[in-house]
Amino acid sequence: MRKDVRIVLAGDPDVGKSTLITSLVKEAYVAKVQKVVPPITLPPEVAPEAVVTKIVDTSSSPEHRANLEAELRRANVICIVYSISAPSSFDRIPTYWLPYIRSLGVNVPVILVGNKIDLRSGDVTNAALEDELAPVMAEFKEVETCVECSARIPLNVSEVFYFAQKAVLYPTAPLYDSREHVLKPACVDALKRIFRLCDSDKDGLLSDGELNDFQRKCFDTPLQAQELEGIKDLVVQAPIAGLRYNHENSSVAASGSSANGDIPSHHPHLREGSLTMAGFLYLHTLFIQRGRLETTWTVLRTFGYGVDLSLQDSFVKPAFAVPPECSVELSPNGYQFLTDIFEVHDKDRDGALSEEELDSLFITAPDNRHPWQGTGFPTSTITDEHGAVTLQGWLAQWSMTTLLDHRTTLAYLAYLGYPSFPLSGSSGSASTPAPIPLTPTGPPGSRPSRNRTPCPPSTITALKLTRPRKTDKKKKGAIQRSVFLGFVLGAAGSGKTAILRNMVGKRFANAYEPTQKMMSVVSTVEQAGAERYLVLQEFGSRYEAEVLRNTAKLSAADVIVFVYDSSDTNSFSYISNLRQQYPLLQSMPSLFVATKADLDLAQQRHEVQPDTYCRKLGLKIPGLGAGPLNISIRDGQSADLYGLICTIAVDPKGAVQGGYDRNALSYGTNRWQFWGYIGLVVIGGGGAVWICAKVLKVPIGSTLGFGSSASTTSWWLSGAQARGAGGPNATKVSSWFDWIRWQSSSNVRSEL
């Protein structure tokens, strides 16, 4: 919102520019004034929207031309003053002043000020004035209005500057086509969206209650009964197709229908006693035509629109910082709002949103589309047998969106009208300035009460931050969150997609189709008597490496689900190699899953079999042990896979290689042992390594290489890669370094 307004007065000599400014300041007529008065500043208390106003006088003499041009370029609004007693000063406005301003490249509102009205001889009708001004306003669209005044009487002096302020704070040009006398398309689109958001029951009408909610939201006060009646009388009396409906002694508000003969049932502005969208647009057209632009602008700004009639970034993209180790979830307010809009758009009351109902729900969003284009929605969440999104699936989908990209959730909460009227309530107080009346009462151009435009409500109240994982670990090891993220990794054809589809209740697909793009699904899972939302993601061969190389993305996962085909001899080697290639995987909570248990078990081509591998990692998962978990999606045997993933996410200690605190080993009691082994290798070479092997009774050929920490593993791995060109000896050294690093972990059992 603008904080200041700069008004520049221009015009021919002796038209009274300086006298007008002096009369405003002195609040009285001053006969002798300076030719050019210094700039004055009006405090925010005397201006709409509490802005600071600077008024600048200028001279039209040739010697001051440079200063005149500089001030015109700095102006937010220009008042061209002419003298009613000197008709030539008015004639020069369209022939000199307006073309001259355009030649400077200045595009700001212009107010025409007819001064010295006290010197006019005879009466002039409004029609005559309009005829005189119409050609000028038709040719020069920057002309907002014309005000006649007198500094001597005085008359309308403060109104001159008030209308100048209004021209900046509530501009006409973005809203109204003064040549065609219609609302501009962007304004129509914005007002239609606002109408739909205020139509709480989605019946295409604004009832008395909805109009009152709208009034409270925008102006912080309810409508009185007579004001409601006045609105309806006003919109019904508009000429429609050449016909004008008169109601004389009848009350539109009381009639409500055509039964009493007062209102034709086909009237486009009012139906069944409620305001239609056409009536809503007509009402705002009247506001603008009668000089009440502040009313329409207040409505637009309340719903987040800026001067360009697009939703402001501060509304759609509010600041919401997410500290490390924290995640974002919907707050109770957010879940309530999403539940409310689900229920109001579920027109057939079948507990699910069909495609048509979803289209209706997102009609207030950009391009009338939901944010999940190209993601497989609604198959990514829970649907009924017809593919319609259930309430459970709807809330789950938004929980996933908030977890993965909370900015999208914030934007769509704004598009969908968060908060709803029941959530926002009335925030009025005795100290709130008087609002602008919704009905445009009073003569055109009359001055309404000043007010501050309310800001749109912040959408961040619909979200909440979770506690950092480290904080949760200190508090009895349990993570206090309700939405968890799991990455599903494994070789092609191992059954990852089947696991994801099964979680959201989709049928098993016999035909194999390789995953070409990232796939995300979400569902509710019962875990320890609580309902959790579990998000599972599969990346496909094209994107898997990209995600695993990105530390930030990988660290966002709560659980890594390693999937292998128990009937394929090469399947387990893929995930074993993956863990060695991306060492950070070794430090993350993990669950190993053997799929296709309905097929014959195959011996895996790997140094050790999967069950031995899991035991040697030191995994102790509640209800499973080390693993792996054997399942068959084809036979419907999932063995509480999803509940187990949530259990690990809540308390990951037993699912991490060697225990949850192994990252601290370099700073614990084994630090001396770790560096001692390093010294032995450096000083004694191969002999020292042989001694270590004898003392610790570990086979010299051991190449298991289970890393003790992500940082240590990464360091040794980079060294091994650097020595890779050195032939077979380099490979052996890398293996010995891996062995020493592995031995330094206090959590790896001696049976390895």
UniProtKB/Swiss-Prot annotation:
UniProt cross-references to NCBIfam families, sorted A to Z: small_GTP
Ranges where the EF-hand domain occurs: 186-221, 333-368
Molecular function (Gene Ontology), one example: GTP binding
Residues the entry annotates as binding Ca(2+) 2: 346, 348, 350, 357
One Pfam entry name: Ras
Protein name: Mitochondrial Rho GTPase 1
Role summary: Mitochondrial GTPase involved in mitochondrial trafficking. Probably involved in control of anterograde transport of mitochondria and their subcellular distribution.
Organism: Mycosarcoma maydis
CDD domains: Miro1 (cd01893), Miro2 (cd01892)
EC primary class: hydrolase
Gene designation: GEM1
This protein's GO CC annotations: ERMES complex; mitochondrial outer membrane
Residues at which GTP 1 binds: 11-18, 57-61, 115-118
Mitochondrial intermembrane side: 693-752
Family: Belongs to the mitochondrial Rho GTPase family.
InterPro entries tied to this protein: EF-hand-dom_pair (IPR011992), EF_Hand_1_Ca_BS (IPR018247), EF_hand_assoc_1 (IPR013566), EF_hand_assoc_2 (IPR013567), EF_hand_dom (IPR002048), Miro-EF-hand_domain (IPR052266), MIRO_dom (IPR020860), P-loop_NTPase (IPR027417)
